[in-house]
Each structure stands twice: as C-alpha cells, then as structure tokens.
Amino acid sequence: CMQSCFQDMDHPAFDYPESTGEVPTTPLKMYLPFDEEDIRDKGEWGFLVADNGNAKFAEDGIAGMAYQGAENAYILAKTPSILENNMPTIGDLTVAFWMRTTKNTSAQGLFSIPNSIKFCGNFDIFLENNNSETQAFFKVHIFNQTAKENDERWVEAKIDDIFGSEWVHLAFVYDGNTSTITVYRNGEGVFTKELPDCGKLKFNNVGASLAVGAFQFSTTPSLTSGAGAQTWAKNFPGQLDQFRLYDKVLTATEIQSIYSG
C-alpha cells in the first residue's frame, strides 16, 4: 500500500482497509478527522495524505484530536488515480471544516486545488488581513474554463465571529447550476454571491496534490511552476478538524447536520 510511505513511525500499527476493487460512489471525496495523531484520509476514495514533517496534533479537537498548524507546517493530499479524471471536471464543490484560530496578521492559506502553471490555484480558500479581532476576511479564488479560458473569479467574504477560543464550523459551497458560492458559519448561511456565467467548475493543469493549510506556492517544492514562496503569504497556524471535500452541492440541511454532528 502506497500510503505506508507516509506512515508515522511513532505510530506504525496502522490497519489498512482492504480494497474491494469497486469504485466508490460517495460524493465525499476526502475526509480528514485527524484523530489518534493519524493524518490519513478516512474517506472511501483514498487520497494519499502526508504532511511536510512538521505537523502536530492538538488534544482538544471538536471531536477527538485536531490538526495543529504552524508557520512551517502544511498537508498535501495526493489525488488517487481513480479521481484524476474527476478533479478537472468536478462541476460543484463543497469544502467544510472546523477551525479555531486567532486574528491573522498576514494572508494565510487554507485550501487549494492547485493549478500547476499559474500563480494562483484553480480553487483557493485563504484568509486575508482584516482589522477586526473577531471578523475573518476570507477570499476564494477560482480559475474556471467557461466560454473564456482560465476565467478568473474572486470572492471576498467578511464573516463575523470567527476568531477566538471557540471552534467554528465553516462550509464553502459552489453551485455550478446557479453559479453561486455560499458560505456557512456554524450551520447557517451567512454569505452568498453569484458569479455570473461561471457555470460548472472545469479546471486546467490540475496539480497532483491538494494543499491544506497552505497556498499552492508556499509548499516545498512549490505545487506550481508559476510561483515560489511569497513573503506576504503564510501557512495556516491555527487548528483544523474534520476537513471534508465533496464534489456536490451540500444543502443547508446537510451542512446543519454536519455541524450538529
């Protein structure tokens, strides 16, 4: 099993699920619960997940343990071969996770579906600077293949009551049928923006690995030939838990259900 390459030698006794040879059908493409100091994907599709050697774990996750980010830490999730043709034509997208962090003083990468030749990724979520001690300034960047090649879209979402000592659940949902992105905080929709004529998500030059807790250009080596590390861009130093990626539009009810646990 290739995943053993990424085995934590302090915790070698992993039980690997036996492959059934059947292609999964679940829209939950990746699930990282981070329990028992185990960084691996617990979804059915089997992303090959590794950190850069600096990942730590926090004991007090939302349930069990959590990922503890740091300025020199990040996670890479290599897309399994059975999904290599799915990622460029993903269509719809939901990224959902628990987060606990304090106010950022630099841009911090949270998630990227990389573009291997561009400065920015195909789909990026990151924190931008904001003056508030509690309100977070999220930015979402998209390169979509519409009638226009590499149709670039930006979403700026200022969401209240994010920073502090409490865990907060976030979900970023892109609906290709309505060209709309919606952000949920603790199960409630708090932000919506239409991206006219954006349509279903189609990506070019998709990088082999997704980035969690970093920008695509902040990894070593960079996930793109289009840029290397930037002084203004940092890795996410806070905590993450129960990180989920779906290739579907989760409904408000489904997101509320995840939040409620």
Task: Identify what each model region corresponds to.
Residues 2-4:
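C-terminal motif of bacterial Sec signal peptides marking the signal peptidase cleavage site
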Residues 6-72, 256-261:
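Extracytoplasmic low-complexity segments
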Residues 14-23, 70-93, 154-160:
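Short surface loop/edge beta-strand patches of beta-sandwich-type extracellular domains
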Residues 29-38, 94-103, 230-260:
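Extracellular, beta-strand-rich glycan-interacting domains
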Residues 97, 166-174, 183:
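Short tryptophan-centered beta-strand motifs in secreted/extracellular beta-sheet-rich domains
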Residues 111-144, 200-202:
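Glycan-recognition/cleft segments
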Residues 141-169:
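Short, aromatic/His-centered strand-loop micro-motif at the edge of beta-sheets
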Residues 194-238:
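Flexible glycan-contacting loops in extracellular carbohydrate-active proteins
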